[in-house]
Amino acid sequence: MTDFQFSKVEDAIEAIRQGKIILVTDDEDRENEGDFICAAEFATPENINFMATYGKGLICTPISTEIAKKLNFHPMVAVNQDNHETAFTVSVDHIDTGTGISAFERSITAMKIVDDNAKATDFRRPGHMFPLIAKDGGVLVRNGHTEATVDLARLAGLKHAGLCCEIMADDGTMMTMPDLQKFAVEHNMPFITIQQLQEYRRKHDSLVKQISVVKMPTKYGEFMAHSFVEVISGKEHVALVKGDLTDGEQVLARIHSECLTGDAFGSQRCDCGQQFAAAMTQIEQEGRGVILYLRQEGRGIGLINKLRAYELQDKGMDTVEANVALGFKEDEREYYIGAQMFQQLGVKSIRLLTNNPAKIEGLKEQGLNIVAREPIIVEPNKNDIDYLKVKQIKMGHMFNF
């Protein structure tokens, strides 16, 4: 179905809020499966029967960590060997059920799981409903249907639990594209991807909070250092602010990814330290601006992996080839945290100091208004010239040498 368009996440959330079933698919390089999803508060016999009839997979009940703790739903096994670490608990039936297997009795069990008065002793173990514990942080931590189910219920303003069921084709294999698309159209069912849900959360959830603000005299001039912490990961970042940002318009700004070797050691294997110095100098001269110092060492792969990549580069690989050889993308960085930091600082539009087109696109995707790109001009040296040429040729960086 070449003309097929996925639903808007907002429409999927509204359908969940109304008690409807939606269809959600994950990445092609993961399970590459579609699941039916609905909220546990609407685990009606009709919804369960639909899942059993058309999905034919295992009907599970994704729940938050809080619900699992409240009801003493413990992991099914001590050592999880599932390919995707799906967090099954011991299966359960509510004590008011008989065999527990009918759509009506599975409905009772699922709805009792989200009953405010429910307690651990209300459930028999084992049973016919299979709770799955979602990771804290949801699809931003694990891109699974378990997390998607709980995230969608939360975004719909409902209890943090739901139902999910894999969809099999008539021949018993897992239904994939384009058959999933055809099914969604035939049943007028909202259909989204987990990637869409991730992007929605990055744009709409508050994922970073400001902790402190202090004066920061530097060799470039006096700045104000604003500390931030990511809500999910606890990762810490800093914004160095110069001048008055009250109107928030056309602020000279840079996102600088942490580079211990370049920023602190003065390494000549990269131009990071030079770029940081140039940006600080330009903002000081301007009298107004922001540098976000993000903890994204080694284009997001971390310090040790960056040094491992250097080892591979010493053996003949370039910076892109080395990252890929270690199992990473050429650039693992994302900029939604930076965009939220700018927003919390009151920045509305920026003149971005960068040579990297991915930063421009990453910030634009988060709704930040970039009115101009200001180049960072540094002189290459004999140790980083090949590295810079690779970034120019393979990653599209905009250099003038």
Swiss-Prot record:
Residues 204-401 are annotated as: GTP cyclohydrolase II. The active site is at residues 331, 333. One of its GO terms (molecular function) is magnesium ion binding. Binds 2 divalent metal cations per subunit. Magnesium or manganese. Zn(2+) binds at residues 259, 270, 272. D-ribulose 5-phosphate binds at residues 30-31, 35, 142-146, 166. The record marks 128, 166 as: Essential for DHBP synthase activity. Residues 1-203 are annotated as: DHBP synthase. Pathway: Cofactor biosynthesis; riboflavin biosynthesis; 2-hydroxy-3-oxobutyl phosphate from D-ribulose 5-phosphate: step 1/1; Cofactor biosynthesis; riboflavin biosynthesis; 5-amino-6-(D-ribitylamino)uracil from GTP: step 1/4. It catalyses: D-ribulose 5-phosphate = (2S)-2-hydroxy-3-oxobutyl phosphate + formate + H(+); GTP + 4 H2O = 2,5-diamino-6-hydroxy-4-(5-phosphoribosylamino)-pyrimidine + formate + 2 phosphate + 3 H(+). Its EC number is 4.1.99.12, 3.5.4.25. One of its GO terms (cellular component) is cytosol. Mg(2+) 1 binds at residue 31. Keywords: GTP-binding, Hydrolase, Lyase, Magnesium, Manganese, Metal-binding, Multifunctional enzyme, Nucleotide-binding, Riboflavin biosynthesis, Zinc. PANTHER family: 3,4-DIHYDROXY-2-BUTANONE 4-PHOSPHATE SYNTHASE, GTP CYCLOHYDROLASE II-RELATED. This is Riboflavin biosynthesis protein RibBA. It comes from Actinobacillus pleuropneumoniae serotype 7 (strain AP76).
